[in-house]
Amino acid sequence: MHFTMEELCASETAKKKGINNKPNAQQMINLVYLCAYVLEPLRLAMKEPIKIGSGFRCEALNKAVGGVSNSQHMKGQAVDLCIDGDMKKGKKWFDYIRKNLPFDQLILEHNSKGSYWVHVSYVYPDFGKNRRQVIENLLKK
């Protein structure tokens, strides 16, 4: 595997604020499934590194970054993938996931500072159903 638990839980905000952003056993299991069914297949297909911008968030970290109260990041079911301002790469990853991989929610997102990322979540079938919800709010051109 190309992904580590450390990178899936890394957070500059958690470091700065002294937040212990450690997942429990169930959250770790969810992260492993997310890697196995979405992140690793994406990495192998794209043949390029996939950088995690935001992965697991404990409740305190989720509040600190302004995450929604029902964020799948808190369950270990979601990550935001960095595309480093490369919308072509972001669109390629987004389209590949949508057409080829299981997912619960897939969003091409941005913030007011001009940062862009791909949000993807996955729910292992034993724990719920994947909705295959797609939100592409950036590339309406």
Residue ranges and their predicted role:
Residues L39-V65:
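Extended, low-complexity, intrinsically disordered C-terminal regulatory tails
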Residues M1-R43, V134-K141:
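Extracytoplasmic cell-surface/polysaccharide-interacting catalytic and binding patches
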Residues A45-K47, M74-A78:
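Short connector loops at helix/strand junctions that flank enzyme active sites
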Residues Y37-M46, K92, Y96-N100:
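Generic non-transmembrane alpha-helical segments
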